[in-house]
């Protein structure tokens, strides 16, 4: 995702990449644009040079500590995506940011992030209705990693795919009650190590709790060459629906559909982070501090143009 942020900043004329901070040896990291590379230990020495720090670490082990620590020094943006733990992450980051007069935007990305906003708008506009969120078709990196941890597996990719019948039922306004299995299927492409028992691997995948057991799961065994050739990208996407009714007798039906089709999941997420970095800087310049989510940030803060231009051209 760091590479994605580097690319997104190159397309943002009002922003400048001061440097990339790494826990590795800075000399070992080659950037795409020739940006300077610093050790993470240097971060606290550069507070006068940097307006916003964009955090590209993982939600499981990096961001719970990193966002809190960095918000003591900088305005920050992260893409924390463990939905169930967002309230506790918010509370910890809010304390740190407020105590140090900084803005910290958490959980920016597309889900949480852009999808969250569309769920909120849908519920606000159509209070009598139902939400539906579908993910894919796309590579789930967490599920792919789970397969790779199975004994006998050399490499793997897992795709999350919406069930077409479920999508069409929602679009027809049938307001279906959908189980996990009825919403998505999982398709796995697996490279088995030489001599590994494929039946044992397949059984371990399809019965894996929290990952595959609740889904209809298909497993394909292919060669490493085929995997590298046909499944090297990280596409993703999804759809947020809000169905609802209006009128005294709920006689009129409505459907809101917001869809993403992404060639590169990390690059799109990075582009969202950069837009919210702009907002964090602007809000802090106005004297605001504390933790913010996409729900708390006015859209005009995200766009490089002024309010006058936005009102004249987009409104």
Describe the residue ranges of each PLM region.
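C-terminal substrate-binding/catalytic lobe of Rossmann-fold NAD(P)-dependent oxidoreductases
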Residues: 3-4, 11-43, 139-277
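Oxidoreductase and adenylate-handling cofactor-binding alpha/beta cores
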Residues: 114-130, 145-155, 279
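Rossmann-fold NAD(P) dinucleotide-binding segment
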Residues: 43-52, 60-79
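Short alpha-helices
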Residues: 98-123, 273
